[in-house]
């Protein structure tokens, strides 16, 4: 049985602790009394994944077996999560490939000829042919690409259809092919409690008209947290949209969960608690840190982006989305949930090299903000690990670097908007429509590999709850000019950051270090 998560209190015997800082990492000594949140040990993966998939398809939750839903002459659309999941990317064969292959085998046996596959990329950049092939596998790729395996296009006026509005007046507009299908099979990887469930189709196949109802400042400030659906206004909106979807299209969802094997064997020390490092782990740390530090940034980036994780699959559940998702969340909680007693004055997070929007790309400063104040700050249930008015300290070098193809509108947002204001509400009011409707950004989204024009604004809104909650934000090791552009302060060391934080929280602050990844979901009591 795997050990549960726990909270360590730093004392004289505690070794230096591993902290991520983008495409680098360090060992850091924390002040005595600092609380350190560790996730549960990695759960064992399912040994026979193919059998687990087949069992899920044939014995689903509150739905007929998939074989009973397939018939000749029907329109079947298989939808799958894009490259924003999982993080880091998983080793091949991808579990999505395994599921899709079995669904296609059952469809062929049932005489289903009209089959299309869609990547649920929402307002994300399109997946490249190579990325699609890596996700679905060579056999599926060769059989369906390019005419029947493609990316969702959230800006195709002919390819979208409005299904109705929710009781709150939210427009539900999704991909036409999916909406007009007899059955959607959605293939999901749930990395955190934020993923899956009602979100999958409503967001993955949605348009800007739909997404603006939940990807806005007010909703995100009242999503406390993204990983606590009960208290997330964003998830409440997803659920309302799912009700409308359920009136128009039948959805058979297949959700999978992963264990905590976030890093491969050559960096296995990153999966372990520091006092349990072997001599080999210590040697690996020293060697990798030396090589990593000596390498140019572009080389480090390429190496880390090709670091594929040997995840084990901890669950495969299929059927009606509302019936499946509770089982999925239970598996996520088994792997990630750690009880924490109360809040601290200061929260500390080390940010890794990866986020949902820099896969095979570059972590630009706006994505650093989104990763830290959005994704990592929101890795809690009930309450944040840091009190209201407290200080958030994040580790990341925050280089002033952008991918010119993927993040075209990010560059303009950074240069023309953040130089004027960092206020999410003002940005939303004054700039969102311009970025969302700009014809050049729309062209790049549809024909190149750029994120939608509005995407950098949404990533800024992603940190709105943290900006409202925290009294100060400090980045350790960050480029000072870049941090200042974003409205944050920079410190050279943790000691400097703590000294700066005392201006806000006093001379004897309590400190909590959220040690992730592997991901820990803090259940703050």
Language-model regions: role of each:
Residues 61-82, 109-112, 338-345, 386-387, ...:
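Glycine-rich phosphate/diphosphate-binding loops that line cofactor/substrate pockets in enzymes
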Residues 75-90, 116-123, 186, 348:
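Short glycine-rich or small-residue beta-strand-to-loop segments that form or flank ligand, phosphate
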Residues 87-111, 206, 375-385, 393:
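Histidine-anchored nucleotide/phosphate-binding helix
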Residues 93-171:
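Well-ordered mid-protein domain cores that form the structural environment of catalytic cofactors
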Residues 111-124, 254, 393-396, 472-477:
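Short internal beta-strands
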Residues 142-343, 374-378:
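Conserved, well-structured core segments that form the ligand-binding/active-site neighborhood
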Residues 360-472:
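C-terminal catalytic subdomain
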């Amino acid at each position: 049985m795997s050990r549960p998560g726990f909270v360590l209190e730093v004392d004289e015997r505690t070794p230096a602790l591993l902290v991520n800082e983008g495409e680098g990492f360090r060992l850091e000594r924390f002040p005595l009394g600092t609380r350190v949140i560790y996730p549960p040990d990695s759960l064992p993966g399912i040994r026979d994944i193919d059998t687990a998939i087949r069992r899920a398809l044939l014995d689903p939750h509150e739905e007929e077996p998939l074989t009973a839903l397939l018939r000749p002459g029907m329109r079947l659309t298989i939808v799958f999560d894009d490259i924003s999941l999982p993080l880091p990317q998983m080793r091949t064969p991808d579990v999505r490939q395994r599921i899709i292959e079995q669904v296609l085998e059952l469809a062929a046996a049932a005489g289903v000829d009209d089959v299309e596959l869609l990547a649920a990329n929402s307002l994300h950049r399109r997946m490249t042919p190579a990325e699609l092939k890596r996700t679905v596998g060579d056999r599926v790729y060769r059989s369906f690409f390019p005419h029947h395996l493609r990316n969702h296009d959230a800006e195709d006026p002919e390819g979208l259809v409005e299904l109705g509005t929710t009781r709150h007046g939210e427009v539900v507009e999704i991909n036409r092919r999916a909406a007009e299908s007899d059955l959607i099979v959605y293939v999901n990887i749930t990395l955190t409690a934020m993923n899956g469930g009602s979100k999958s189709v409503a967001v993955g196949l949605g348009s800007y008209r739909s997404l603006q109802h939940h990807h806005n400042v007010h909703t995100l400030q009242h999503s406390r947290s993204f990983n606590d659906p009960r208290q997330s206004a964003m998830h409440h909106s997803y659920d309302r949209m799912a009700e409308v979807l359920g009136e128009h299209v039948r959805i058979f969802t297949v959700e999978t969960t992963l264990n905590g094997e976030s890093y491969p064997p050559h960096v296995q020390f990153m999966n372990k608690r520091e006092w349990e490092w072997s001599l080999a782990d210590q040697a690996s740390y020293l060697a990798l840190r030396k090589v990593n530090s000596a390498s140019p940034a572009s080389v480090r980036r390429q190496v880390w982006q090709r670091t594929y994780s040997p995840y084990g699959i901890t669950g495969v559940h299929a059927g009606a989305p509302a019936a499946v998702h509770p089982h999925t969340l239970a598996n996520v909680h088994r792997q990630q949930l750690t009880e924490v007693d109360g809040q601290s004055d200061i929260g500390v997070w080390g940010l890794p090299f990866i986020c949902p929007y820099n896969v095979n790309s570059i972590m630009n400063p706006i994505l650093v903000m989104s990763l830290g104040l959005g994704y990592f700050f929101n890795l809690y249930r009930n309450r944040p690990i840091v009190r209201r008015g407290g200080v958030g300290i994040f580790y990341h070098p925050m280089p002033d670097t952008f991918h010119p193809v993927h993040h075209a509108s990010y560059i303009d947002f950074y240069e023309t908007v953040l130089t004027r204001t960092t206020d999410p509400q003002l940005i939303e009011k004054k700039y969102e429509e311009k970025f969302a409707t700009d014809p050049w950004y729309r062209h790049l989204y549809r024909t190149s590999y750029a994120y939608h024009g509005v995407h950098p604004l949404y990533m800024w809104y992603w940190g709105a709850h943290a900006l409202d909650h925290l009294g100060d934000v400090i980045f350790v090791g960050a480029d000072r000019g870049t941090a200042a552009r974003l409205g944050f302060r920079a410190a050279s060391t943790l000691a400097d950051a703590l000294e700066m934080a005392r201006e806000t929280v006093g001379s004897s602050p309590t400190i909590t270090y959220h040690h992730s990844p592997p991901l820990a979901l803090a259940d703050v009591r």
